[in-house]
Structures are given as structure tokens and as C-alpha cells.
Amino acid sequence: MLGLEHQTEPEKQMAVRVIGYEGANYRNQYKAKQITPVITLVLYFGTEKRWQYPQNLKALMDIPDGLESYVNDYHIHVFEIAWLTDEQINMF
């Protein structure tokens, strides 16, 4: 399952949104014999500023000492479309 999230403005809590989308999809697969991977790509089309917000969940948190190893992290995949080099564009 592939999801595309289109963004024209950076969003600080995007990792939380993507977790919600993917979690809902996995929840729908709860009773399936086999779980299908869910991949969400964030396509950022902003031209005025680069994506400067965290691309993982832990970076959004203030985790107390000693608990970090118990907190699951989650990474999102952000592609800054307007900032691709000509070389990168030619790969497609």
C-alpha cells in the first residue's frame, strides 16, 4: 500500500499525521492472514523554504532520561520536490 501526502507548507508534526494514516491502514488489516506493508511518502512542493522540521517521532518529544530505549521511534520520508537538482530529476 502506497500513500502520498502532498504538502505545500512544512508541518512540524507530520510524523504524527503519517503514523495516524499508516496505523489506520494496518488496523484495517488486523484480521488478514498476511499484513501488507504501508509506505507513505510526503511530497513537499514548497518553494519558499526547505523542510526544516523533524522527520522522526522522537525528535518531537522531550523524553525523560532512561526512557528513550522504551519509546518507539518512527521515521517519515519527505521528498522536497521543488528543491531537486537537475541530476536528481533526470533519474526519473
Q: What do these predicted ranges mean?
A:
Residues 1-92:
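Conserved single-residue anchors adjacent to enzymatic active/cofactor-binding motifs
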